[in-house]
Amino acid sequence: MTPLSSELVGFTIPFYSKTQKPYSNSSHGLLLSHNRSSLLTFSNSNPNNDNGRSFSSSGARNLQTTTTTDATLPTERRQQHSQSLGFRDTQMLKIFHRSCRSGNYIESLHLLETMVRKGYNPDVILCTKLIKGFFTLRNIPKAVRVMEILEKFGQPDVFAYNALINGFCKMNRIDDATRVLDRMRSKDFSPDTVTYNIMIGSLCSRGKLDLALKVLNQLLSDNCQPTVITYTILIEATMLEGGVDEALKLMDEMLSRGLKPDMFTYNTIIRGMCKEGMVDRAFEMVRNLELKGCEPDVISYNILLRALLNQGKWEEGEKLMTKMFSEKCDPNVVTYSILITTLCRDGKIEEAMNLLKLMKEKGLTPDAYSYDPLIAAFCREGRLDVAIEFLETMISDGCLPDIVNYNTVLATLCKNGKADQALEIFGKLGEVGCSPNSSSYNTMFSALWSSGDKIRALHMILEMMSNGIDPDEITYNSMISCLCREGMVDEAFELLVDMRSCEFHPSVVTYNIVLLGFCKAHRIEDAINVLESMVGNGCRPNETTYTVLIEGIGFAGYRAEAMELANDLVRIDAISEYSFKRLHRTFPLLNVLQRSSQTFGY
C-alpha cells in the first residue's frame, strides 16, 4: 500500500464515523460495522446532552407518564415548610435566580430539584426561562424534566407550555409539540394565539402547509382568535408554493374577520407575485393600496425594483425610483445593493463603483451584500488584485467581509492556480472574525488535491469536521472522486452509502464516478450493483452511465455481454451516434455494427 493509500484508509474511517447519522439503518457494513462504537461515541459527544432518560419519539409521552421521585416529603409538610420559610426570601432562591441569569442551566436545575425536595414551590417564570435555556442547549430531557417538576410541585401556565412547544418545533419534533398541546387541553389550559402561531409557523417553515391549515381550523374551533401574524405566516407559506390566488383568498378571509393586513402582509404578497413573474399584477396591488390610503414602504419599492431589473427593464426601474423619491421614500442600503448587483451583472462595473460612492455620500454604510457583486465582477474579469484590495477597503470602512466575499476570492485564486495565495487568505479568516464554511473548505480541498498535495487536502477535510462543519454534497462528490482515482473504490462506495444516510441525494455524476471505479477494477458485478442501486434510488442513468458500463464489461473480457448490452441500448436510442462511434473505436463491436448500420448510416 502506498503512503497516500495508507493515509486515505486512515482518513475515511473517521470521516465516515463522523458523518454517519446515528439513526441510520444502513446494512453496508465495511466501515459502519467497524465503527459502530465510534458512531455511538460521536453521537454522545455533546457535553450538553443528557445521558439519562431517553426522549426519542416518546419524549412528550414521558411528560404524561413520569412520576417524579425527587420530592418525597408529604404534601402537608411541604406546604407548611414553604409557608414557614418564605420561598422567595431564601438564599437558595437568590442563587437560583443568579444561575438562571448567567445561563448556568445545569446548576439551576440542580438547585430547583434541591428546593422542591425541601418543600419549596417552583417559580413558573424561572422554570419557563430554564426550559428555554435547555432547548438552546438542545438538551431535551432536561427541558422536559423542568416541566415535570413544575407540573408536580408548581403551577405551570400557558407561557411555560408555549416555551416547551416552541422548543420542540424548533428542533423539528412536531409530534412531540402536538402531544404537549394535547396535554395542555387535558389539564384545562386553553392554548392561546401564540401557541397556535408557534405550531403554524413551524409547520409552514418545513413545507407542511396542509397541516398548518388544519391547525388554523383547530384554532378557530377552540374559539381562539387568529391575528394578522397568523394569516401572514400562512400567506407567506402559500406564496412559497406558488399559490398566489390561494394566498389572496387567505387575505380575503383575514379581512372578513376584521383583521387589517399590515405592510409586511402586503409585501409578502407583492414578493410572491414578483417571484412568479407577475410583476404587472404586483404593481396593480400597489396601486390599489394607494387608493386605500396605504402607502408602500421602501421594502415594497425594493421588491418591485428588483423584479423590474431582473427582467432588464431599466427604464421602468428608473421611473419607479423617480416615484419613490416623489413619495419621499428614501432609498436604503438594500435599494443601492439591488442597483449595484444589476449593474455588475450587466458588466457596468464603473457605474456600479460610482453608485457605491454615491451611497456613501448619502450617509449610508454599505454592507457585505453591497460589496459582493463588485468583488465577484472583478474576479470574473481576472482583476484579482483589485478584488483583494476591495476586501481591505471593506474592513477600513468598518464593514467586515462575510464568508461569501472571501469564498469568491478564494475560488478565483484556486481556479487561476494560485492555491498558495488562497491558503494564505484562508489561514487569516479566523483573525478577521470570519470563520470558513463548507464551501471554503471544499474550494481549498479541490485546489490542493488538483495541485498534487493530496495529504494536505485530506487534512483540510479533517479540520473542517473537527471545527463542527458538516460535509455537504460537494464534499462527498469531491471525496468520492478522489478515492476512485486512487483505486479505493470500496471506500468511495461506503461514502456513497453514507451520503444517502445523511439525506443527500447523489447525482448521476456521483454514481457514474463510482461505476467507473468498479469498471476500471474489472469488478463488473459490483458495477451492476451500483447501477441497480442508482435506479432503485430514483436516479436515472444517462448516456455516460451506459457507455462506462459497456466499456467496463468489454475490457473485463466479457465482449459478448458488452455487445449484447450495446445492441439493446442502440435499439432503444439510449446511446447517441457519437458515443457509439467512440465505443467502436475503443474495441470493435462487430455484431453491434452490423445491426446498427442502418441506424447510423454505415
Swiss-Prot record:
Composition skew (Polar residues), residue ranges: 42-64
Keyword tags: Chloroplast, Plastid, Repeat, Transit peptide
Ranges of Low complexity composition bias in the record: 65-74
Spans of repeat PPR: 88-122, 123-153, 157-191, 192-226, 227-261, 262-296, 297-331, 332-366, 367-401, 402-436, 437-471, 472-506, 507-541, 542-576
GO CC entries: chloroplast
A GO term, aspect molecular function: mRNA binding
Domain of life of the source: Eukaryota
Transit peptide endpoints, chain numbering: 1-78
Protein's cellular compartments: Plastid, Chloroplast
Region annotated Disordered, chain positions: 42-85
NCBIfam families per record: PPR (TIGR00756)
Family label: Belongs to the PPR family. P subfamily.
Name assigned to this protein: Pentatricopeptide repeat-containing protein At3g04760, chloroplastic
